[in-house]
């Protein structure tokens, strides 16, 4: 018989840097999960990723206080900022442009995000990422 699910906890945690301080500690402490056990498992799973990159994680907490977790790919906005070499997007994306990004870089990001996106094909996913780039004030070059 399958374990009874008590809760799903969604967090964004820096790769390789999970520790019991907020947001991890309070979110998991409320569910009665062993926080250090999660931190060690998460850090071990994300050690091959770039340290400090925010990684979305969905933690499934069971009634017996055990847990499983699934890591996702980093948010598109974070990958776009990294590719364009900027610190933050534009406050007025239609007026102030903050950087440029090539279509090849967009396709590379779409390939990275393909596992988490529900697009029909890579072209549709690339267009979705392109929309995110434009809303951040990035100019897309061919």
Swiss-Prot record:
Residues of the signal peptide: none
Keywords (alphabetical) are: Methylation, Ribonucleoprotein, Ribosomal protein, RNA-binding, rRNA-binding
Partners and quaternary state?
Answer: Part of the ribosomal stalk of the 50S ribosomal subunit. Interacts with L10 and the large rRNA to form the base of the stalk. L10 forms an elongated spine to which L12 dimers bind in a sequential fashion forming a multimeric L10(L12)X complex.
Q: Which Pfam families match?
A: Ribosomal_L11, Ribosomal_L11_N
Q: Which organism is it from?
A: Klebsiella pneumoniae (strain 342)
Q: What is this protein called?
A: Large ribosomal subunit protein uL11
What domain of life? Bacteria
Q: Name one GO cellular component term.
A: cytosolic large ribosomal subunit
Function comment: Forms part of the ribosomal stalk which helps the ribosome interact with GTP-bound translation factors.
* GO-annotated molecular function: large ribosomal subunit rRNA binding; structural constituent of ribosome
PTM per Swiss-Prot/TrEMBL: One or more lysine residues are methylated.
- Statement: the UniProt record of this protein carries the keyword rRNA-binding: yes
What PANTHER family is this protein classified in? Answer: 60S RIBOSOMAL PROTEIN L12, LARGE RIBOSOMAL SUBUNIT PROTEIN UL11M
């Amino acid at each position: 018989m399958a374990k009874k699910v008590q809760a799903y906890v969604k967090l964004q945690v820096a790769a390789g840097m999970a520790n019991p301080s907020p947001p991890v500690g309070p979110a998991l402490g409320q569910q009665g999960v062993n926080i250090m056990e999660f931190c060690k498992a998460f850090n071990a799973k994300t050690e091959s990723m770039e340290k400090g990159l925010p990684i979305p994680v969905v933690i499934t907490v069971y009634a017996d206080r055990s847990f499983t977790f699934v890591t996702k790919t980093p948010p598109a906005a974070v990958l776009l900022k990294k590719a364009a070499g900027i610190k933050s997007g534009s406050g007025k994306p239609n007026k102030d442009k903050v950087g440029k990004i090539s279509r090849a870089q967009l396709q590379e990001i779409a390939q990275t995000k393909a596992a988490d996106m529900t697009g029909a094909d890579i072209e549709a996913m690339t267009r979705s990422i392109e929309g995110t780039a434009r809303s951040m004030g990035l100019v897309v070059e061919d």
